Each structure stands twice: as structure tokens, then as C-alpha cells.
Design a protein with these regions (language model features):
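P-loop NTPase Walker
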Residues: 24-123, 307, 497
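Conserved helicase NTPase motor core
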Residues: 32-33, 39-48, 56, 194-279, ...
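Conserved helicase motor core of SF1/SF2 NTP-dependent helicases
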Residues: 60-69, 77, 87-91, 109, ...
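Conserved P-loop NTPase-based nucleic-acid remodeling module centered on helicase motor cores
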Residues: 89-161, 356, 362-371
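ATP-hydrolysis module of ASCE/P-loop NTPase motor domains
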Residues: 120-203, 207, 386-407
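Conserved helicase NTPase catalytic core signature
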Residues: 163-231, 416-442
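Conserved helicase/translocase motor-coupling segment
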Residues: 332-448, 452
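C-terminal accessory regions
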Residues: 417-450, 456-462, 467-533, 538
Length: 546
């Protein structure tokens, strides 16, 4: 493999003038220590100084760069009442312990719920197709049964709830919701789509009218809140928005209409939820741009590797590791406990089978993985009534799933189909083994499994990155990947930056990183690997593609 230090050095040379906002009036803020006693970096000081002068900020905070602590320092220096918007409940609860008392720490959903509690109390739950059929009139249309129509209607309602649109109309006719819809001809297909749009619009109308008792989901009341044109500026003097790279259009619409000072923090290279409606907020937001590029999570070898990934996307600022943190890129073997990060749930199914005698933990639980395995097998055996997983429930047959995947190449479906095809009807034995593996709490596990999506915000000492990426299998040109698969690169970046100590790259990942280093004809140098580890029981971790 080529060395990547030269790539990082080149990025530094290209980014020499990034401190374009550093000519600020002195505010007697020294560079010694924060209020909590830790040393602030020059980048953190610039952010605090600019915020105190009242500027709207866009802070690009790389992985492990202390974004939350920077926001806390900003909050301590700002006067008036502030709002810290957290991405989820766990982040919000942690933030309450860190931010000063003049800053409210909330999620967008908690604000929206409080504003609408009187009209939605007792109605909020996860909906299913039977709720839709029970609450509004749903009829069969051509080959699409009531359940099929209700399923598409619910998907469209969810897409609308995350959008910035004012109503459900023909704008959504090209939505991903309808990718699998096929009539016998164009006229039938159009009629099916229009009928689903009509039914979704009807449900939304009825569930939002005064006195309605129809059930709604959590994202629905956030949408109701957005449509009410809320004025947060009446309550708050400044807003701190964390993890803004994963904001969806409905939340962005709320924030962009506020006139108070706004400080956005996030890492656009960690945007991995576009399939859920999130957009790259940095492209839509206004404000003075700053970087937090010094990571306090890992050392220089992992930061150099991560810099190669973001540089290939056009990022000119390198991610810098902390020199006195010892992190290594290893090969072949890994100390236990270690965490295996996978692109897909299907790869986790494969890997669980490789370690039958070990204490295992699956981040987020094993239920979703079992649901995927059971639903895939039910589809394979034409047991359609037992297809429960949302990703597979839309298909009427195994062949319909394969036809869809030939066009759209979903990573989970691709690998799941491969595994089931290999095992055939004996795949039911695989399901049994997954159900009866030795699962324990994370702190007791020898091996931890997680999808990269679920690893977001986490960190572990020893990390193995699996190579179950569609972009590896299809061997696309780098230019095509940068054009069509940018989020896959983001996932790789998220994964490699979860490691605090040792990182093991499986075969496909190593080959791909070599291609990235060669991209744009970077100077060919070599990554140095540390002597391979052995696991506690002497077993090696298989790096080859499964």
C-alpha cells in the first residue's frame, strides 16, 4: 500500500489561507485554558471569538475534534438565552450536564411535541399498513392489493414529513417511494402513483385536522410544527445546532427562518443518512466558515488515512491526529475485545457464524438482523405473509427483489441474496445459529458487531473494517464513485475514525485505499504496518472477502 503522509502535506499547502476570518478585534480572550482547565486550540479560539462578535458560524468539525466542547465554550461566552439543538435524546441528556444554565438543551422533536402536546397526546406511535387501511378508505388498484397501497401510502407520508414541502401533491410522483411501482403499462403505473399520492394526502389532511384521533408518528408532529411557521427568535438569542450535516429539509426550513444568531457545527464528510431524508446542510447554510481539524481521538496514522478519503472528495484541509496518541493500522490479526464494523446487516449475519464459541454483542440488538434474515428466507421460499422487514416487504416475490436490486444495487439485498442462494433451504439452520449465539452486554463481549450507521458517534480501542461495499464489488472508477456514491466514501471515513487504538482494514478496503492514494497521481509512498497482533485465543481474523 502507498504511504499517505505526502497526501496530507499537500492538503496543508493547499489550505494555507483557511483562516480567512481571523482578523478579529481583540476581546481579551486568552489562549491559555478553557473554563474547565483544558487547552484550547487556535481553531477553537477563532470560533469562540467570532461567535462573541455576533457572527453566524458554520464550523466544519472533523471526527473527534472537540465540537461539543467548542460549543460549550461558545455558550459560556455568549449572553442572553440560548438553545442547543441535539441530534437525538442521548446527546441531549449528555449536553444538559455540560452546557451553562442559560442554554436550553433540546431535540427538535421535543420542541415540536411541547408546541403540539394538547392535540397529539396519546396518538403518537409507529404506524403500520393496518393503521392506514383502518383510518382511510384504501382500495385495490390494478395488481396492487390494499396492503400494497397502504404500504406505499405510509412510505410517502414519511417522505413528506421529512421534506420542506407544504403539501402532498404530484411533486412527489418521482419520489424514491415509487421506484418499485410497475403497472402493465405507463398508464397503469401513473394511475397507481396518483392514487397513492391521493391517499397519503387524505390521511395527512385527516390526521392534522382539529380534534383528530388518527395515529401519527414522531416525524409527523415535527412536520406539523414546521408548517406552523414557529418563531424561536422570540425565545432565544442564539441557536447552537449540532450534527447539522444530518439535518433533513423540514428542520433546515425551521432554522433558516430564524433571525437570531445561529452557529452550525458538523462534519459534511459524516453525512450518511440521505436515504432517510437528510441533506448536506453546509451547502444551504450561511455564515463565516471555520474548521476544527485537530482530532483528540486518535494519532497520526489514522488521521492520515482519513485525510486521504476526504481529500479525494475535494477537501483541502487535512485531519490532524494527536501526536502522543499511539494508533496503528494493523493486518491479519486483532487483540480482543475488538469491534467489527460492517456496511450491511447481511455481513453481520455472515460474521456471527464465524465466531460460534465467543461472547458476542450486536450494537442496537440482534432483532433487526434476525428480521432481515427471516424475511429474506420467507421471500426465497415464497412465504410472503412472513416477510416483515421493511426493506423487503415491498416485494411480491424473490424474483421481484432480484429485479429491483439489479437496477438499484442495495448493499444489504445484494449480500443477503448471495448468502441465501448459497445455502438454499438450509438457510433456516443459519437463522437458528444466529438466534442461539452467545450474546452478552457490550462490556463483556469478546467481539462487538455494528453497522457503520449505528457506529456513528461511538469509538472503540480496536476496530476491524469489513469490505462489504458495493463500490468494491463493482470496481467503479474513482470519478464515478465521487459522482454517484459519495455517501459510501463518507461511510468509510466514519468507520476508520471510530478507532482509538488499532485499525484493521480487510482486503477490499486496503485495495480501495490504494486506489484513492493513486487518484490524482499523488506521490507514491507507503503506509507502514505494525507487527500483526494475535487474538487472545490465538485465532486470526480472516481478512479475505467472505
Amino acid at each position: 500500500m502507498r504511504k499517505i503522509g505526502a497526501v496530507v502535506k499537500n492538503m496543508e499547502l493547499q489550505c494555507g489561507d483557511y483562516k480567512k476570518h481571523n482578523q478579529l478585534t481583540s476581546i481579551n480572550y486568552t489562549r491559555t485554558d478553557s473554563d474547565d482547565g483544558y487547552q484550547l486550540t487556535d481553531e477553537q479560539i477563532l470560533c469562540v471569538e467570532s461567535a462573541v462578535q455576533g457572527h453566524d458560524l458554520k464550523i466544519k468539525a472533523f471526527a473527534g475534534s472537540g465540537k461539543t466542547s467548542t460549543l460549550v465554550e461558545i455558550a459560556k461566552k455568549l449572553s442572553g438565552r440560548g438553545l442547543y439543538l441535539a441530534y437525538n435524546k442521548s446527546i441531549q441528556l449528555d449536553a444538559v450536564k455540560k452546557f451553562p444554565v442559560h442554554v436550553d438543551c433540546k431535540t427538535a422533536h421535543s420542541i415540536a411535541y411541547a408546541a403540539n402536546a394538547y392535540r397529539i397526546k396519546g396518538r403518537v406511535r409507529n404506524l403500520n399498513v393496518f393503521d392506514i387501511i383502518e383510518c382511510i378508505e384504501i382500495e385495490r388498484i390494478y395488481a396492487y392489493e390494499e396492503n400494497d397501497v397502504a404500504f406505499l401510502t405510509l412510505k410517502l407520508l414519511r417522505i413528506f414529513a421529512n421534506s420542506d414541502r407544504q403539501k402532498i401533491d404530484k411533486y412527489f410522483s418521482t419520489s424514491l417511494v415509487f421506484d418499485t411501482v410497475e403497472g402493465n403499462n405507463f398508464k397503469e403505473t401513473k394511475a397507481i402513483i396518483n392514487y397513492v399520492i391521493n391517499r397519503a394526502s387524505k390521511y395527512w389532511e385527516q390526521c392534522t385536522e382539529e380534534g383528530s384521533i388518527l395515529p401519527i408518528e414522531h416525524d409527523f408532529y415535527l412536520k406539523i410544527y414546521q408548517l406552523s411557521q414557529p418563531d424561536l427568535t422570540a425565545t432565544y438569542d442564539f441557536i447552537l445546532f449540532d450534527e447539522c450535516q444530518d439535518a433533513n429539509p423540514v428542520l433546515l426550513d425551521i432554522l433558516l427562518k430564524q433571525t437570531c444568531q445561529k452557529i452550525y457545527v458538523g462534519d459534511e464528510h459524516q453525512q450518511i443518512y440521505s436515504w432517510r431524508g437528510s441533506v448536506n446542510a453546509f451547502a444551504k447554510l450561511e455564515g463565516a466558515e471555520y474548521y476544527l481539524s485537530q482530532s483528540f481521538r486518535f494519532g497520526e496514522k489514522i488521521s492520515e488515512l482519513a485525510s486521504v478519503i476526504i481529500h479525494s472528495k475535494g477537501e483541502k484541509k487535512p485531519l490532524r491526529g494527536t501526536a502522543n496518541i499511539n494508533t496503528e493500522i494493523v493486518q491479519n490479526c486483532m487483540e480482543r475485545p475488538f469491534t467489527v464494523l460492517c456496511r450491511t446487516n447481511a455481513r453481520i449475519i455472515e460474521k456471527i457464524l464465524r465466531f460460534p464459541e465467543n461472547r458476542l454483542h450486536v450494537v442496537g440488538g440482534v432483532v433487526e438482523i434476525l428480521n432481515l434474515a427471516k424475511s429474506g428466507f420467507a421471500l426465497f421460499t415464497d412465504d410472503i405473509s412472513n416477510v416483515k422487514h421493511l426493506k423487503l416487504k415491498q416485494f411480491k416475490s424473490w424474483n421481484a427483489m432480484l429485479h429491483f436490486n439489479h437496477k438499484y444495487q442495495d448493499p444489504d439485498i445484494t449480500l443477503l441474496a448471495k448468502i441465501i442462494k448459497e445455502h438454499g433451504v438450509s438457510f433456516k439452520n443459519i437463522i437458528y445459529k444466529i438466534e442461539n449465539a452467545n450474546y452478552v452486554e457490550e462490556r463483556l463481549a469478546d467481539i462487538i458487531f455494528s453497522t457503520i450507521h449505528k457506529s456513528k458517534g461511538r469509538e472503540w480501542n480496536n476496530v476491524v473494517l469489513e469490505d462489504d461495499f458495493i463500490i468494491f464489488c463493482n470496481n467503479q472508477e474513482i470519478e464515478e464513485i465521487l459522482l454517484n456514491y459519495i455517501e459510501e466514501l463518507n461511510l468509510i471515513y466514519v468507520a476508520v475514525t471510530r478507532a482509538k487504538g488499532n485499525l484493521l482494514l480487510t482486503k477490499g478496503v486496503k485495495v480501495f485505499i490504494e486506489r484513492l492514494v493513486s487518484y490524482k497521481k499523488q506521490k507514491p509512498l507507503k503506509i507502514e504496518f505494525k507487527e500483526s497482533f494475535r487474538t487472545i485465543d490465538g485465532a486470526s481474523y480472516e481478512c479475505a472477502r467472505a
